[in-house]
Amino acid sequence: MKKLKPLFAILTAALILFSAVCFLYPAISNAINEQYNESRIDDYNNNVDSISQEDIDDYFSAAEKYNKALATDVSTDDSKLSILSHYDEILDLDDGVMGYVEIPSINVRLPIYHGESEDVLTKGAAHLEHTSFPIGGESTHVCISAHCGYPTQKFFDDIDELENGDEIYIYVLDRTLKYTVTGTDVVEPDDSSKLEVVQGKDLLTLVTCTPYGVNSHRLLVHAERAPFEAATSDSAATVSQVTRTVPKSHQLQIIIAGLAVIAVVIVKV
């Protein structure tokens, strides 16, 4: 009987530890994916730092042409169709990321990818094709979509908590764009009337599924461009640092340390 006690203790500890891992799986998975997103954003910033100002200007020029073509009323113009057909090449630094979005009030920081494929939506935020590229300017309407209720990571789960006046930051190349929330809408999935360009306006809309777990409609969070002084790489880093109550790069280490403590306590008991 005494020989069984150590085995019983080990099995009990293993069972409790396994239960703890299952309970913490969403947090662990989220921390891993957030760390991956941080590395993608770091890689993007390093890529931007490595290219010349001339190349940066060329990237913006191509995006501006796309946005102007998108804002024109003639949908069958050959030159417009030609420009729009090069969507995947615009703001493409060969790493798949065109920039990143940051929402301080709900602690969101995600890379932005081209298009709304399922592969993209499992990694970060998606820029909706046939909407303006996120470079700012009059008569532009940027639309960025992300999952809600995804099992392995939080994306736009909390954008329903955003209030008028909350700030959203978009980082593209060497530009930092600041938008403030102006309102929300709930629409049918095929209703794009709220995503159209408004002449003279510089707009941003965040898109996700709603209600949570049902996903029968789309939640739209609208925002409008606001002044942001000294939008340099240094100021962008400062904004990024203050948005996170716990740095995402440390979340996984905290969880692992917690599991280790649980295991030690159980084994000693």
What are these regions (language model features)?
Residues 239-269:
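C-terminal single-pass membrane-anchor helix
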